[in-house]
Amino acid sequence: MVSMKFLSTVFAAITAANAAEILSVPNTQDVIPDSYIVVMKDEVATSDLEAHVTWVRNHHHSGHVRRNGTLTGLKTTFDISGFRGYLGAFDHDTLDEILADDKVKFVEPNRIMRIQGTQTQRGAPWGLARLSSSRPGGSDYVYDDRAGEGVIIYGVDTGIDVNHPDFEGRATWGINTIDQDNTDGNGHGTHTAGTFAGARFGVAKKATIVGVKVLDAQGSGSNSAIMEGISWSVDHARKNNALGRAVMNLSLGGSFSQAVNDAAERAVRAGVFLAVAAGNDNQDASNYSPASAPNVCTVGATDRMDVRATFSNFGSVLDIFAPGVDVESTMPGGGTQMMSGTSMAAPHIAGLGAYLMSTENLQPSQVCDRIKQLASNSVRNPGNGSTSKLANNGIGQ
């Protein structure tokens, strides 16, 4: 796989003022190793392209023989109403020479594209069905089959049963900052993970799941343990080149904490989308953390009839509402259970964030605004100062 580090190194090595550049790509997972699309400048005539192509073939052949290489070189040319160039598989030395030619406009790594269809999950949990429906009462979840592929979701919670069959082997254990028990002794974390990325219960059915345990079996944890979990998650995403393709679900909260809010803000700034529960006290969420952090996506809960749940916090810091009453999802040991809370609403948004990153190639900083754009103004009795926006994945029925 061609790494972005190599691509940037090659570009840095080209010092000529008129040298072409290798364009960066948003998802290096799809890059075909050593395969490139070379685009010529607009003013390059067909005859100049032919001369350049001949030179490339000869240069590649002589150098490749000398280096005992196996790459095929130039494969095909294209000319689409004056948009000219070629496709080939080249080693680094040949690519350097191509980039230095002033006839070349840019080079782009060749990548895989796939059919883009939608899937329909019949008899889906009501919360999922509501995400793809224009009105309450539906039973089908319609979604784009990219479904969070290539995105990591960090479940910062009570831990996750990574062996639950609904996770299909996509879940791994990350870190435990609260105790010595590397299991989900509460069930809350496994439930939220099922909602954001389970195969049956989840929004982003192809996302990678990482369990970050910051709460104990009673569902409690210190601010410092939570901050350590946030810090570890950002560092893990950075080490795995996932910043910009990472989501954090924080179905937790407490009274206002500047330190916790600042930790959440730094995670957003680093390149992680944060979905945060608004809280369950029927109070103004501006007094809660991390719900009141300015750039997280704060989530209130609704019931099956699009009414704000009686327990859901409210207020101007809420960005969006999502289903949060009687939500069925995964539980430790392989089973399922019903839970209610803004903790159940937030993972719908974490999953939707990952989903939109994969389908629309959004940056984390764009995700919450995009979710609000796609939402319907459907929430009844949203609470004083609250939005009435209810999450939708944009497919609609």
Curated annotation (Swiss-Prot):
Protein name per the record: Subtilisin-like protease CPC735_066880
Chief place where the protein resides: secreted
Domain called Peptidase S8: residue spans: 125-397
Ranges of Polar residues composition bias in the record: 377-391
Residue ranges constituting the Inhibitor I9 domain according to the UniProt record: 35-115
Residue ranges annotated as propeptide in the record: 20-116
Glycosylation sites: 249, 384
Catalytic EC class: hydrolase
Entry annotation: catalytic residues: 157, 188, 343
Region (Disordered): 377-397
